[in-house]
Regions:
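Flexible metal-binding regulatory segments at protein termini and peripheral loops
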Residues: 1-122, 236, 316-317, 321-329, ...
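Hydrophobic alpha-helical transmembrane segments
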Residues: 131-141, 148-151, 158, 165, ...
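P-type ATPase nucleotide-binding
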Residues: 443-574, 584, 596-611
Length: 741
């Protein structure tokens, strides 16, 4: 059984990887992925051994709060920005008290300047008050950090909590000696506590703002979903809930309103804003017979539409589900960071303790408290400067921003692995009709051995039951010439060949067949000299003999810009192959015209499937680009499946990438975005590993002989900057652009 839910209380990748590691050890858990950024978890488990409630209990034992839905954050008295501002104010107050005299004696009043028990104690008490206020403002670090430590799942908050608490306790200890007149003054770390917390809070705030902006893509789409729609019933408008709409309902769409579910216009016309699908800002003109999609907006004029999907299966629902899955899933490249994070925090705590002991022993002065002070500073610096956040943010932040960028390009990735794998593709297999071409073949000529209107009537009656684009071309042609439709029975579809049905022909019920040449065993011939898509119409005389009645010649022109985009793809060193069920002449012509490397014509669904298998067996990483029902098996077999927007539901389910702008440029964009994303992730990981590899030894004091020691305050600043640098580098993907060929 597969389940998705949310986990609250996670602060860094040590949290998410700890949950994965703990549950992954259970025999009944087959697979688990926890995403830190959107707090989601996907788990696959054996329902015969456990249930979701038991899994929730296991997660709660680790110190986290699993929930089926995210709860709204409780409104606090201070907003995050106000809390941050107050932390900065009180931090400056404490720094002023602790360091003002060193900077300039005139900065402090005389009562706090003289070094004697009374003035030093008063100064320290004021620092303590300021530090406690800052700690209260940053209390989440202590609540989450010590909670995680108690459950033996230490995280970033644990490092901050231990380090600042150690500094506070040491300061309180020294303050006690001053208060009891055993010491004349103490060496306090109140300003270090404040500066560390302030820097960490600033870093976290920047992280959260950036994360929220990246997550806005799905939130914006969800806002496009109307709660109600106008349903026509007995010639009256009735406002109904969108969830109650069923296929076949007639809906009225008013100007300025969103389309509730997918459907087809049956009366009127409109201009629709489909930018949430295609990324294109210009409105799209729609008329009777055109499809409309949920979540798009009607600019002006009202129209009637017939629902072809319910809310659950609508285009918008599928997009939201894809974005959620993409944001919740993990790329393979993140596994390295997860493995390191699983031992990172415990290792840092061990290193900090070891460094403390070593410095306590080898510190250069014989004074114990002097040595203790140096050792404590090293201990706190090591804990604070270590940054599992930079490591944990490296991959998911880039994936999050990349998915947001993809949606603006009309692209949607099924999961992070699809985004990661697209860059590795070295062979692309294209379907022709509707993928490279406009997908709307038009009849350019008809050759008939019977009365033309009768042929049109027979063909359109049978083809009307098909969703194939070629069939629609025939139906449209017949409709324009007012050919009457006939009643049918015993409809049979032979996938990849054609359709047959019993139809009234010359006063008798005859089996009429409509399809390609291989669908027939003709006893007669039709001389056709022109090239194009041939659709034959015939009468079945027996099981093995057919009489040809006529043929439609259609043409499907290539989409605008396809040739240039295929050239861009080939410039990446990728092999291209056209795999089509069309005849050899048409496929060859299309291949030469568009500059595709090779082609296979007259390919049936099984032929396409076999070719994909063959390419994969040769070690090729294959991307299949298609849009029709016949493509579904091949799409599922390919390494990366790309579906053009208006494909059938079956094809969309098999897709790794969906292009809602129905443009081959999307294929090139997906590959380039994949390359840019992985490059960005590698930059983030390189920085995160280098940062920790360099700064942890520095915090330990390895360059003490060169008079280089990092104070806890500087360590806090460095830690915050490391996370912020990863976030800012990930944001560079927002500026990703596709260069025109």
């Amino acid at each position: 059984m597969k389940e998705s839910f949310y986990i609250e209380g996670m602060t860094c990748t040590a949290c998410s990887s700890g949950i994965e590691r703990s549950l992954g050890r259970k025999s009944f858990v087959k697979k688990i992925e926890v995403n830190l950024l959107n707090k989601s978890a996907n788990i696959e488990f054996d329902e015969n051994q456990t249930n979701l409630d038991e899994i929730f209990k296991l997660i709660e034992k680790l110190g986290y709060s699993p929930k089926k839905t995210l709860t709204k954050e409780k409104k606090e008295f201070f907003s995050p920005n106000v809390k941050l501002a107050l932390a900065v104010v009180f931090m400056l107050f404490v720094v002023y008290l602790s360091m003002g005299a060193m900077l300039s004696p005139s900065l402090l009043p005389e009562s706090l300047l003289t070094i004697n028990n009374h003035s030093n104690f008063l100064n320290a008490c004021l620092q303590l008050i300021g530090a406690l206020i800052v700690m209260h403002l940053g209390r989440d670090f202590y609540i989450q950090g010590f909670k995680a430590l108690w459950h033996r799942q230490p995280n970033m908050s644990s490092l901050i909590a231990i380090g600042t608490s150690a500094a506070l306790i040491s300061s309180l200890w020294q303050l006690y000696f001053v208060y009891t007149n055993q010491w004349s003054y103490g060496h306090y770390y109140f300003e270090s506590v404040c500066v560390i917390l302030m820097f960490v809070m600033v870093g976290k705030r920047i992280e959260n703002v950036s994360k929220d902006k990246a997550l806005d893509a799905m939130q914006a789409l969800m806002k496009n979903t109307p709660k109600t729609a106008l349903k026509m019933q007995n010639n009256q408008q009735i406002e109904v809930l969108v969830d109650s709409i069923v296929v076949g309902d007639i809906l009225k769409v008013l100007p300025g309103s969103a389309i509730a579910v997918d459907g087809e216009i049956i009366e009127g016309e409109g201009e629709l804003d489909e930018s949430m699908l295609s990324g294109e800002a210009l409105p799209v003109y729609k008329k009777v017979g055109d499809k409309v999609f949920s979540g798009t907006f009607n600019s002006h004029t009202s129209f009637l539409m017939k629902a072809t999907q319910n809310n659950k299966n609508s285009t918008l629902s599928q997009i939201i589900e894809m974005i959620h899955n993409a944001q919740s899933s993990k790329a393979e490249i993140s596994r390295l960071a997860d493995k390191v994070s699983s031992v990172f925090v415990p290792s840092v705590i061990a290193i900090a303790i070891l460094a403390f002991v070593v410095w306590l022993i080898i510190a250069p002065k014989p004074d114990f408290w002097w040595n203790f002070g140096i050792a404590l500073e090293v201990f706190v610096s090591v804990l604070v400067i270590s940054c599992p956040c930079a490591l944990g943010l490296a991959t998911p932040m880039s994936i999050l921003v990349a998915n947001q960028k993809a949606s603006s390009l009309g692209l949607f990735f099924k999961d992070a692995k699809s985004l990661e794998k697209a860059r590795l593709v070295n062979t692309i297999v294209f379907d022709k009709t509707g993928t490279l071409t406009n997908g709307k073949p038009v009849v350019k000529s008809v050759h008939s051995k019977i009365e033309l209107l009768e042929l049109l009537s027979l063909a359109s009656s049978i083809e009307k039951s098909s969703e194939h684009v070629i069939a629609k071309g025939v139906v449209e042609y017949a409709k324009e010439r007012n050919a009457p439709l006939k009643e049918m029975s015993e409809i049979k579809v032979k996938t990849g060949f054609g359709i047959s049905a019993k139809v009234d022909y010359q006063g008798a019920k005859e089996i009429i067949k409509v399809g390609n040449s291989e669908f027939f065993n003709p006893i007669n011939t039709l001389e056709i000299e022109e090239n194009g898509i041939l659709v034959f119409v015939g009468r079945a005389i027996s099981e093995k003999e057919d009489e040809l009645l006529g043929v439609f010649v259609l043409e499907d022109l290539p989409k605008k810009g396809v040739k240039e985009h295929i050239a861009q793809i080939k410039d990446l060193g990728i092999n291209t192959l056209l795999l089509s069920g069309d005849n050899r002449e048409n496929v060859k012509k299309c291949t030469l015209e568009l500059g595709i490397d090779d082609y296979i014509s007259n390919a049936k669904p099984q032929d396409k499937l076999n070719k994909i298998k063959e390419l994969k067996e040769k070690g090729q990483i294959v991307m299949m680009v298609g849009d029709g029902l016949n493509d579904a098996p091949s799409l599922a077999m390919s390494d990366v499946a790309v579906v053009m927007a208006k494909g059938s539901d079956v094809s969309v389910q098999a897709a790794d990438i969906v292009s809602f702008n129905n443009d081959i440029k999307s294929v090139y964009s997906a590959i380039k975005l994949s390359q840019a994303t992985i490059k960005n992730i590698k930059e983030n990981l390189f920085w995160a590993f280098c940062y920790n590899s360099v700064f942890i030894p520095l915090a330990c004091g390895v360059l003490y002989k060169a008079n280089i020691m990092l104070s806890p305050a500087i360590a806090g600043l460095a830690m915050s900057l490391s996370s912020v640098s990863v976030v800012l580098n990930s944001q560079r993907l927002r500026n990703f652009k596709i260069k025109d060929h």
